[in-house]
């Protein structure tokens, strides 16, 4: 049985890990190998911590890469020649060079990410995409770089591109969920993180589950907030209605000018005003009269004069007498024409 791609990748990661642990390479070299191991494990869909388990179940039976290569080097030359003649070359040379170039650019981007040089990382991933635009990993990595710079709109676009290229690539949904959550869209983030769990199934890590639970909690908080807002609005409407005057009487002082506000405290005038407002056409009459230039000029004079005008002066004002006659239908007021006084004189 031939080894799977995952098992071969695990062999490589295991080999790099042993070199780093034994300090057989410089610190800069160790950093580069750590980035490489992250990239390889990400590309083949396994965690670095799972390498020993993968190799233990494989046909390699815990062998290291160096042991396997050393065993192969001891194969007789005649057998090597026969094997070489039977190998089919399925990858065109141009394609292999293209992939190698794109992977090198991606590695440079990953190294820039490790150094927190996110702008450089974006540039390198962009170059890799130009070389090989069909690789979902490049878009997902660039989405992570954009999110690190809080450029969440661009991160969403790259994550969606990764998903469209490879719908089974869980990191595309993971990057999308992170960006959507940062944008304040927990419902969409929850949907993306749910997709991650669906794809990974039993292989889902604790980090993936935490992301999902965080988005779920945010959605629940948002729903609770939306539920309380209408209740607060209803309370505000009740308070506003309680602030209106008895019987729905409008603020005539405000309607006719600030100077008349004090007169509205007179009980007799208030009683007359309430009686007037029982007439359905009263407000229409008031609005019509306010279009009269003389009455409007009178109201503006009260508003600009400040204070409450003298009642005797008001009743001697022809415009006001005319307005009262129109509102009260002649009761308690005289029109401005020459109509005689019909009351009995003592």
From Swiss-Prot:
GO terms for biological process: post-translational protein targeting to endoplasmic reticulum membrane; response to heat. GO terms for cellular component: cytoplasm; cytosol; membrane; TRC complex. The modification Phosphothreonine is found at residue 308. TPR repeats lie at residues 102-135, 136-169, 170-203, 205-229. Residues 228-237 have a biased composition (Basic and acidic residues). It is found in: Cytoplasm. InterPro entries: SGT (IPR047150), SGTA_dimer (IPR032374), TPR-like_helical_dom_sf (IPR011990), TPR_rpt (IPR019734). GO terms for molecular function: identical protein binding; molecular adaptor activity. Present with 9424 molecules/cell in log phase SD medium. Co-chaperone that binds to the molecular chaperone Hsp70 (SSA1 and SSA2). Regulates Hsp70 ATPase activity. Required for recovery from heat shock. This is Small glutamine-rich tetratricopeptide repeat-containing protein 2.
């Amino acid at each position: 049985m031939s080894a799977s791609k995952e098992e071969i990748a695990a062999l490589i990661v295991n080999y790099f890990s042993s070199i780093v642990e034994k300090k057989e390479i410089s610190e800069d070299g160790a950093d580069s190998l750590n980035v490489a191991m992250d990239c390889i494990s990400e590309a083949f869909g396994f965690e670095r911590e799972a390498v020993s388990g993968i190799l233990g179940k494989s046909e390699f039976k815990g062998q290291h890469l160096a042991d396997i290569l050393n065993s192969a080097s001891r194969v007789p030359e005649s057998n090597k020649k026969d094997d070489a003649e039977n190998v089919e070359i399925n990858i065109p040379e141009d394609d292999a060079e293209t992939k190698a170039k794109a992977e090198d650019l991606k590695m440079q981007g990953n190294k820039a990410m490790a150094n927190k040089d996110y702008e450089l990382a974006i540039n390198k991933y962009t170059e890799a995409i130009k070389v090989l635009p069909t690789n979902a990993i490049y878009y997902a990595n660039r989405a992570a770089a954009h999110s690190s710079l809080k450029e969440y709109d661009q991160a969403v676009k790259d994550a969606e591109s990764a998903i469209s290229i490879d719908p089974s690539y869980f990191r595309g949904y993971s990057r999308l969920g992170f960006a959507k959550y940062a944008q304040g869209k927990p419902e969409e983030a929850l949907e993306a993180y749910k997709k991650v769990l669906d794809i990974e199934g039993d292989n889902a890590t604790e980090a993936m589950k935490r992301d999902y639970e965080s988005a779920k909690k945010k959605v629940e908080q948002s729903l609770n907030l939306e539920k309380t807002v209408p209740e607060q609005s209803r309370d505000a409407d009740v308070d506003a209605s309680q602030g209106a005057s008895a019987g729905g009487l409008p603020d005539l002082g405000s309607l006719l000018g600030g100077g008349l506000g004090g007169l509205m405290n007179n009980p007799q005038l208030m009683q007359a005003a309430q009686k007037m407002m029982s007439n359905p056409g009263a407000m229409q009459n008031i609005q019509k009269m306010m279009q009269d230039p003389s009455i409007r000029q009178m109201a503006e004079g009260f508003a600009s004069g400040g204070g409450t005008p003298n009642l005797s002066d008001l009743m001697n004002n022809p415009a006001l007498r005319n307005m009262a006659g129109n509102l009260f239908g002649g009761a308690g007021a005289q029109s401005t024409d020459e109509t005689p006084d019909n009351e009995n004189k003592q």
